[in-house]
Amino acid sequence: MFNINMEIKEKSITTFIGPSGCGKTTLLKSINRLNDLIDGVKMSGVIKIFDKDIFDKDIDITKLRTEVGMVFQKPNPFPISIYDNVVYGLRSLGIKDKKILDQICEESLVKAALWDEVKDILISPALGLSGGQQQRLCIARAIAMKPKILLMDEPTSALDPIATLKVEELVLDLKKDYTIVMVTHSLQQATRISDYTGYFLKGELVEFNKTKKIFTNPKDRRTENYISGRYE
């Protein structure tokens, strides 16, 4: 990837758009260094989160990934109970106090707009939930770690329109507390929920601006071609 230079505003929603293979997800996973897990990946440049370069030698990777949560394209609840899914990360950090776990579990499910639907079945298997519920559970699991940033890689691509709407409404609500960066192939979704949009093509950030400006007055011809359906 190249020509990547942007400032993501705190407590905003930023979407990355562009054709498949243009580098959207690669960049997204760079923000919490998930790309480190891929053999042969090389990185040059700087990514700063709150004025700290995440590639500095003294960076605590575990802490970084706690502060920068990730929600993947396909809902991926663990094959355990709903409750255990939400508190899984907390337990891995050594938190064992049941009152604390119960409180954070409820808070996270409330924020994920799922509490009312599952509060009476917390011990039930998470895999028994619908696809939309599973994705909101995964968001609750990420929220439970109290991140500052939420990364979302096409979080509604595997969901039906009704479930998609619920997740979009949730994301808009979460913006009050979190900075959200999302990859989407849906231009309509980008216009509905994002404050800022970056258009990527062949590994290059072609244009980055407020979403309204990207879709109504793009500066680059390549951006205009893509959003008008003339991309080849």
Swiss-Prot record:
UniProt: ATP binding residues: 18-25
Gene3D superfamilies: P-loop containing nucleotide triphosphate hydrolases (3.40.50.300)
Catalytic activity, as annotated: phosphate(out) + ATP + H2O = ADP + 2 phosphate(in) + H(+)
Membrane is among the record's keywords: yes
CDD domains xref list: ABC_PstB_phosphate_transporter
GO MF terms, alphabetically ordered: ATP binding; ATP hydrolysis activity; ATPase-coupled phosphate ion transmembrane transporter activity
Membrane topology note: Peripheral membrane protein
Role noted for this protein: Part of the ABC transporter complex PstSACB involved in phosphate import. Responsible for energy coupling to the transport system.
This protein's name: Phosphate import ATP-binding protein PstB
Classification lineage: Bacteria, Bacillati, Mycoplasmatota, Mollicutes, Mycoplasmataceae
Gene this protein is translated from: pstB
